[in-house]
Amino acid sequence: MKTALFSFLFSALLLLGCNGETPIQPDIPDELDETEILIYEEIQIPTKPAGTPTFTATETIDGSKGGYVKIKESYITEDDDTVLIDVKLKIKKDCFSGNADITMTMDDIYTAVSFSPDMVFENPVELDVKYKGLDPDQLNFPSGEYEFLYIDDDGNTETVPSYGVNVNAELGEISVKKAKLSHFSRYAFGR
């Protein structure tokens, strides 16, 4: 009895489903939803006194061995506050082929860092960035509203995978650990 009922239902499904008409197409709206564009504001560092150099470091890295590029600097603001900047780029072995002179440059206005030459990596490199002594007003947002971002030449942004952005507004501190960079460009904290 079950077999007969199953055969009848299956035959009915085939007859109703295969009637020679054009297949059903999903509804496609005339206007596509606009993609939400997130706009981030970069976080400013306190003004450097005149004559303070741009912080930069260059290291020759053998891609088969890997290596580090580090910047650990500080400066005194016009208000006699100290700003500390501690940045470390870790390049694991075999992220790229050959040797390269890799330059890391800290921005003079924002909590941002740029790299050269232009490179794309077979495996991501890791970046740790920490600023301390920033204006607390620049950090007056809940911690979850901060991101570490890749910023292209047109100002478009993309969140960089990391262990997260940590903020301590009282100390004027913001940091990111193990940000995964797949290529060199400009990266910054944004809110």
Question: What does each model-identified segment do?
Answer:
Residues 175-191:
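C-terminal beta-strand-rich structural cap/linker in extracellular carbohydrate-active enzymes
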Residues 127, 172-173:
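Aromatic sugar-binding surface patches on proteins
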Residues 159-169:
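Solvent-exposed serine/threonine-rich low-complexity stretches and specific carbohydrate-binding patches
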Residues 14-48, 191:
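Bacterial Sec-dependent N-terminal signal peptides
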